[in-house]
Curated annotation (Swiss-Prot):
Species: Bovine coronavirus (strain Quebec)
Protein's name according to its UniProt entry: Non-structural protein of 12.7 kDa
Family of this protein: Belongs to the coronaviruses ns12.7 protein family.
Effect of residue 43 to I: In strain: Isolate BCQ.7373
Effect in UniProt of substituting residue 5 to R: In strain: Isolate Yoo
Database matches in Pfam families: Corona_NS12-7
């Protein structure tokens, strides 16, 4: 089987479904505004058994000066049989990670 990953040129972006919850978390904890993309998974891809659609997001950090970004913190990919399920799963994972990371960083000051 060929290795497959979502490519930027094939992604469509959305702010529907529960993306507003993710936008709120990113704004609250000082991350770059999220761009959630989704695409159809090809039938020959190794991950097709995970679902027909893929949603993806790369999380970027922001500096305290608000004009520079730290760069990539992590990336998220979620698979499901509908676009809505994939995006909702991605938003849940990303918001959960953002709140977990905030709690862990607060432990160290």
């Amino acid at each position: 089987m060929d290795i497959w990953k979502p490519e930027i040129k094939y992604l469509r972006y959305t702010n529907g479904f529960n993306v507003s919850e993710l936008e709120d978390a990113c704004f609250k904890f000082n991350y770059k505004f999220p761009k959630v993309g989704y695409c159809r998974v090809p039938s020959h891809a190794w991950c097709r058994n995970q679902g027909s659609f893929c949603a993806t997001l790369t999380l970027y950090g922001k500096s305290k000066h608000y004009d520079k970004y730290f760069g990539v913190i992590t990336g998220f990919t979620a698979f499901a049989n509908t676009v809505e399920e994939a995006v909702n799963k991605l938003v849940f994972l990303a918001v959960d990670f953002i709140t977990w990371r905030r709690q862990e960083l607060n432990v160290y000051g």
